[in-house]
Amino acid sequence: LGDVYKRQERYDSVWMGLKAVKGDLPKEATEGIVFIHDGARPMVSEDILERCFQDAQKYNACVAAVPVKDTIKIADENGFAETTPRRDRVWQVQTPQTFSFGLIYDAYAQLAAQKDTLAEKGIKITDDAMVVETFTDHQVKLTEGSYRNLKVTTPEDLPLAEKYLRS
């Protein structure tokens, strides 16, 4: 899987990983569930993994997520608030993002085939669920995540991550 880590976009790495799995494993092994997880989320719990596995078996596509606590604003291109979505309908998506292998593989194959036209269509892929949402008719289930499953990406994240790791 060495080449998987040398891609420009995250989705390129995931696609390379999916192709490597499909090529390296017997066919029956690619008929199961695949977890796609962000290495910047080191505190994922067994409970989240189990819930995602159960929901992926039931719905074929799910992502760990938590309801947002803050009000969210959608901004225009000049940084002015344009609209405010209903907070009770807005979720913060985490990883793992979990899918039946065939569904996520086929969605990524469509992405790969149309990759050159994404920018002109105004599409910026930000996660694996978006690949499924954009290139299939399949819905993605939001599965209960945890506020402790934080993404550690900036120095400001470290004290909270350390606190969680100590507890």
Spans of features found by a protein language model:
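Short, flexible, basic/aromatic active-site loop/helix in glycosyltransferases
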Residues: I74-F99
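Short, hinge-like loop/turn segments at secondary-structure boundaries
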Residues: A20-V21, F53, N78-T84, P159-A161
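Short, flexible turn/loop "capping" segments at secondary-structure junctions
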Residues: I33-V34, T84-D88, L142
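Short, small-residue-biased leader/transition segments that mark boundaries at the very start
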Residues: L1-Y5
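Short secondary-structure boundary/capping segments
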Residues: L25-P26, Q54, E82-T83, V132, ...
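Conserved beta-loop-beta/alpha segment of the NTase-like Rossmann-fold superfamily
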Residues: R10-A75, Q94
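Residues at secondary-structure transition points
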Residues: Q8-D12, M16, E120-D127
